[in-house]
């Protein structure tokens, strides 16, 4: 059992009783799913290993059935020429460790996470070349320890919803600090013990909205940079520079843990790539008056107001917590703002030295009963892959793009109410029949039989593998060529992108 299970039980009434016991049933249908990838002409699949499925008590004996499942899945992918991309943690800490010492709030988690990662590297690293330690560490820390909206549901009033335990002023910073230390420890282990033999790469993932000033006022511009520092710099600054942003240290003060000198040196550069989950841009308005509050949480420390457009008559975006959680943050479709993705990549180029980046998630939320024609999702996919091409023209070191999600699956916050999938799952059918949506009409390419398999391709000098510019020969449009799954029951489309050689600026 993991901490996600407890969350699903608590929110069952708000998700029509949905749980993840079966979801899209990839555990039993992995061969069918891999065949669907083959039929679609895809090249890579990213999935999470469930820590509690592999090591039920968090440490100690390995579950042979869990080990066999992941070996079966990886082998099935490899035998079909499909790259496995693996994430080690997706909000699914074993409940035993949460109960024993408080999970991510305790430094013991660094030791146990590293031991778990060691098992994964040892058992699967001969075939898995791409490792992501943590999915959305920033969101997990805030949702799990500030709002109570994600496992393990820690929060304190007035900053969360239905708070029964936790401290929203301190715990998000403490949990996030331990996440960074655990990532650093696992990455160091991989680089020292496995990388030379297995020739793989390791990184970490975070959520990254693009923030835009609501007005031309100086205070809104300052607030926008503050929002970037709190959400993005919280992780990117230590990973690139070895310490937290100055504005975070000034505002959070002693509530923000400090890195020891050795820790700072070790976290700095502890990645081969960064994974970004991007969905849309947000407009930022300054609200520095929040900083006068005697007790603050992560969001009052940010001291901003957030909206999805410059129309102030619209309901503000629920960036922190909502009275009717999770319903009112899961309604309607995301605004399609492809240019914001381009701006985000440009920001990483300028602020963080242009590190190798994978867009690990990007997608369109629709209601589950929406049309299979799925025009909004098609428009979103075209727009965002086009923006990625523009970012490449401007020198971005982006390496790949993942579309959330491949299948309609259980969403952690609203069960099966939302539909992100490129393929529809009939949950009323006992066999979970799949139906294609309009995305299948998009142009796409597959490798010819003469091309090398993905895991045989030569790595480029950056050590990440073929760059977007080098990977395909496509005439000006995105090539949809691979699949990602960010949890055992979830999958998303992954596409490497390369424009036609005739397009200027991408020689």
Where are these regions (language model features)?
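Catalytic domains of carbohydrate-active enzymes, especially glycoside hydrolases
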Residues: 29-50, 351
